[in-house]
């Protein structure tokens, strides 16, 4: 039985809304002025990718800082898994090895890594089509991850309950890392080549 993880999905959908149309908007006005001054499409594309990364990192930094301050104010700040929160986000019970530090590391790191990948995919698709299609494409990719348990369905790699740190029979961490790295590199190269050929 598949239980739709609404809380997880809301977190995953936050980044696409933050990315939305920045790259497309920057193909006009000030962005074009910068492109003319630097005279390098590769440098321009790299600057967009850097902005993309910083936006994702900022979103998660705010989330983690908020959680830190909340825990500090309530006097229950710790690096232990919050059972109630874990079950709300994942719709799964806390594993027997909840004290395993790798579960906590996975929960903190992999959602960020996956968001970095989907943000770049979104920006690249948006550049070739339009911002709405780019945003809907990565949202659909995440939704499909709920129903298809495969590392190529990118959202699976941000779900600790589908990883080998939660259950040894599930997606291996190295598979998740490999998929994220390969997809990021391929999309980065495709985006750069596409932008070099784009008529602005």
What spans do the regions from the language model cover?
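Secretory targeting signals
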Residues: 1-22, 46-127, 131, 162-180
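Transmembrane helix boundary and interhelical loop/hinge segments in multi-pass membrane proteins
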Residues: 19-37, 41
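Cytoplasmic membrane-interface regions of multi-pass membrane proteins
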Residues: 31, 130, 197-200
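Residue-level recognition of pore/gate-forming positions within transmembrane alpha-helices
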Residues: 51-52, 139-143, 184
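Structural signal for membrane-spanning alpha-helices in multi-pass inner-membrane proteins
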Residues: 59, 63, 67, 71, ...
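Central hydrophobic cores of alpha-helical transmembrane segments
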Residues: 130-146
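Juxtamembrane "helix-exit" motif on the non-cytosolic side of transmembrane helices
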Residues: 149-167
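Junction motif at the cytosolic side of a transmembrane helix
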Residues: 182-200
């Amino acid at each position: 039985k598949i239980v739709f993880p609404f809380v997880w999905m809301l977190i995953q959908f936050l980044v696409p809304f933050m990315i939305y149309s920045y790259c497309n908007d920057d193909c006009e006005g000030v962005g074009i002025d910068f492109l003319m001054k630097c005279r390098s499409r590769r440098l321009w594309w790299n600057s967009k990718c850097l902005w993309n990364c910083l936006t994702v990192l900022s979103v998660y930094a705010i989330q983690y800082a908020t959680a830190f301050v909340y825990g500090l104010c309530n006097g229950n700040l710790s690096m232990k898994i919050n059972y109630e929160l874990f079950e709300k986000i994942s719709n799964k019970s806390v594993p027997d090895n909840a004290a395993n530090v790798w579960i906590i590391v996975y929960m903190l790191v992999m959602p960020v890594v996956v968001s970095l990948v989907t943000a770049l995919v979104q920006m690249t698709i948006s550049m070739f089509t339009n911002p709405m299609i780019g945003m809907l494409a990565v949202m659909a990719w995440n939704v499909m991850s709920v129903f298809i348990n495969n590392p190529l369905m990118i959202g699976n790699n941000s779900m600790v309950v589908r990883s080998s740190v939660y259950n040894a029979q599930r997606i291996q961490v190295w598979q998740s890392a490999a998929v994220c790295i390969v997809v990021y590199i391929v999309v980065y190269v495709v985006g750069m080549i596409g932008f070099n050929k784009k008529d602005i």
